[in-house]
Amino acid sequence: MAEVPADSRGATYLGFDFGERNIGVAVGQSVTGTAAPLRTLRAQPSARLWAAISELIDQWLPAGLVVGLSHQQDGSENPITAPTLRFCRQLEGRYRLPVYTVDETLTTAESRTHFYQRRRRKSVEFEQVKDEMAAQLILQTWFSIDKASPR
């Protein structure tokens, strides 16, 4: 969708793990290549979702937005791919910020592993934070790859 500008080193980015029920959000800094989970938003009602995203954008003033794009393990699209791309277009249209995508295959499974290794908590607690933890991994993955190519 967009190329990363050369002067964006040290910039703040918001990452999104899109789902039809919940959307995980993380914040990260490109200078360190690290991200932290922020919160999980309910996807419905739509007006409340966009108000919450607007609030986060006003608070963090990101240079861009990164959305995880899910595919099957063989690279083909899955049922969530089209709604995710629609969400990307909506973000771009509403906020006039560059929107980048990165492969998010297995990020929720990876976040589960990180959660249990570090916190040794109950599965109920994981369910509350899994989407924002997946958003954190999406953003960290994006920081670690060659970002010169557009979405």
UniProtKB/Swiss-Prot annotation:
Provide GO CC annotations from the record. cytosol
Where does the sequence pass through the membrane?
A: none
Entry's localization field: Cytoplasm
User: Broadest EC class?
Assistant: hydrolase
The record lists its disulfide bonds as: none
The signal peptide, as residue positions, is none
Q: Which UniProt keywords apply?
A: Cytoplasm, Hydrolase, Nuclease, Ribosome biogenesis
The answer to keyword Transcription regulation applying to this record is no
Enzyme Commission identifier(s):
3.1.-.-
State the InterPro entries in the record: RNaseH-like_sf (IPR012337), YqgF (IPR005227), YqgF/RNaseH-like_dom (IPR006641), YqgF/RNaseH-like_dom_sf (IPR037027)
The record's GO molecular-function terms, alphabetically, read: nuclease activity
Q: What Pfam family does this protein match (any one)?
A: RuvX
Protein family: Belongs to the YqgF nuclease family.
Q: Which HAMAP family match?
A: Nuclease_YqgF (MF_00651)
Question: What's the stated role of this polypeptide?
Answer: Could be a nuclease involved in processing of the 5'-end of pre-16S rRNA.
Name it: Putative pre-16S rRNA nuclease
Species source reads Methylococcus capsulatus (strain ATCC 33009 / NCIMB 11132 / Bath)
